[in-house]
Amino acid sequence: MKLIKKKIKGLFEIKLKKKKDKRGYFMRVCDNDLLNKKKLSNNWIHFNESFTKKKGTFRGFHYQEKPYQESKLVRVVKGSIQDIIIDLRKKSKTYLSHVSIIVSEGKNMVFIPKGCAHGFCTLQSNCIISYFHDNIYKKSKERGILWKSKKLKIKFKVKPKYINKKDSKYKDISFIKKF
């Protein structure tokens, strides 16, 4: 595994390494020692998986308010996504900026620090995404940002066509509560 820093502090793309032989392959997908060396949270409390049927489905932008902010480790088990992370930390140099990373099956993952919103658009049909979380889910602290907020100026690789009602009702980023 190799960690690559991104412009948002604490955000890393993690390149995966497959060890192949005639039986197939072996690949490490979580290495807490490596995360500890970079002082990244890895006290994983729960693990989720989502299945998305259609290419062009957008999920997000989701985050939780204090004290339930969470770090996430996001991995694509099948398919590929455009993963987008927005820095919501008011004191951050990259406040309200975003990073877009193409995450593909067996190639890479993303470590997302606390205080960031997260969303993704599927680039293929039948995607499976898994997530590690380091804090409990608290429905009353769940928040979101509208996926098509003009201020973000996101360049989607695939135009989002399928968005659920909840995600489509979030407010523009200019209305979010600052951390």
What function would you assign to each model-found segment?
Residues 114-133:
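Ligand-binding loop in jelly-roll beta-barrel domains
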Residues 1-104, 108, 126, 133-179:
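Non-catalytic, conserved peripheral segments adjacent to functional cores
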